[in-house]
């Protein structure tokens, strides 16, 4: 199970499985034959340089909407960033999903906020290395990549996810002081 909350299929299959593997320690009930394996993360993400932002340059803000794009992030962030004094405003790279690309670019333009808006980011290791702060959903693999890259984050879980697994994923980092759960 890749999430902090066991999904329906894995919950059903766990009854007949000889061993249960979990990406987040404690997903399966204690006493079950479980192995905390973690989730797979590419080596280049583990090799992300240590964060060294000292305030002498604009903050680098990476916004990740996931593969489908998170419409609330696409709409709210440009308007929120517009309220920041332009001299203090971060540099923004926003991954918004293919279907939201034009709308997200338009939202930044209307807000008067400069941003590099992309449908997809192929080099996630490079994106994490560039970022000082990440705002994103809380899918299991994204949360694990953030932990591996050592990047602080504001996590905005998908509100209608089955079993609210994204909130549990986000809480895993937030409870350890590695993220803020929104």
Regions found by a protein language model. Give the residues of each.
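Active-site-proximal region of nucleotide-activated glycan assembly enzymes
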Residues: 1-48
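Catalytic binding pocket for nucleotide-activated donors in carbohydrate/polymer assembly enzymes
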Residues: 148-182
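Acidic donor-binding loop of glycosyltransferase active sites
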Residues: 129-144, 151-152
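Well-ordered beta-strand positions
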Residues: 18-19, 33, 126, 133, ...
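Short glycine-/small-residue-rich Rossmann-like dinucleotide-binding loops
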Residues: 25, 66, 97, 139-140, ...
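Donor-nucleotide binding loops and adjacent catalytic segments primarily
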Residues: 53-134, 166-171, 175, 182
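Short, glycine/polar-rich helix-capping loops at beta-to-alpha or helix-loop-helix junctions
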Residues: 5-10, 23-30, 103, 142-143, ...
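A short structural motif in glycosyltransferase catalytic domains
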Residues: 118, 137, 155-156
